[in-house]
């Protein structure tokens, strides 16, 4: 795992370094043309001022007819260090998690504790959305529409629902008073 993380990070740094021509040093100490206008050092002399291409070939900055040296960019450096820190931290966390999982599996510690066994058994639960219910369970008629009869075992609702799936005793459901 470490063997693949380090080359990947090296490749990232190499690709970033080759983009600006400064190599890996450009990642840790980036340069930019941003900054205070009055705090510029001239670069390339009069020839670079007259020829912007010469100024850029010297890796200097050209703006407003002035050729000047790049300066270290602290904001970009901070961003690079932040990204590098999070990348290394993430790789370290991933490697540690994999090693810990592997160690626990080798020591046969990946079983549920005794107090959780049986609590997650979903085979005993009754779903209200189950398609296996009989037609008499799907819709409970109101008390006024049919005469009261002795309930059968299959007709009792034991799901523990709260929205009128079953009635208790002499309660009425949705129908209201229909014995006028």
UniProtKB/Swiss-Prot annotation:
Cytoplasmic side of membrane: 103-180
Stretch forming the signal peptide: 1-21
UniProt keyword rRNA processing, yes or no: no
Positions of the P-type domain: 31-71
Cysteines engaged in disulfide bonds, as pairs: 33-61, 43-60, 55-67
InterPro entries according to UniProt: P_trefoil_dom_sf, TMEM190
Cellular component aspect of the GO annotation: inner acrosomal membrane
Bias (Basic and acidic residues) ranges: 131-140
Cellular compartments annotated: Membrane
Topology, Extracellular side: 22-81
Any Gene Ontology biological process: hematopoietic progenitor cell differentiation
Protein name: Transmembrane protein 190
